[in-house]
């Protein structure tokens, strides 16, 4: 039996605002945007060059969901965006106004820097070291 993780849900306040940020600012690809009901869409995005796990943008539909926006992991890093060009992506994201909350650092596992998306979620931008 073979399994893989297809998508991870990310609760957002507005579909179009989220698409604009993740695709416009971070350069992700919009994989699918299908209207299911007048209030609900199936919106999948994925980092450019990736054919792996997608992010399902899930628009908050009640107060409990709205309270979780930007804090789905209780303040911990939620998503780890791996790149093969850390310096290039860091510069591009900085130029695009991404909110980096620390300076890049080298760890045993690679080069990493934490940022917050426009909704407050913590991400790591990461380039793995060749030895790991």
What are the residue ranges of the model-derived segments?
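Vicinal oxygen chelate
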Residues: 1-7, 29-82, 88-116, 126-132
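Conserved beta-strand-loop-alpha-helix junction that forms the acyl-donor binding cleft
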Residues: 12-15, 36-38
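Conserved phosphate-binding and hydrolysis motifs of nucleotide-dependent enzymes
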Residues: 14, 117-120
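Helix N-cap motif at beta-to-alpha junctions
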Residues: 14-15, 84-86
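Conserved active-site tyrosine of GNAT-family acetyltransferases
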Residues: 18-23, 93, 120
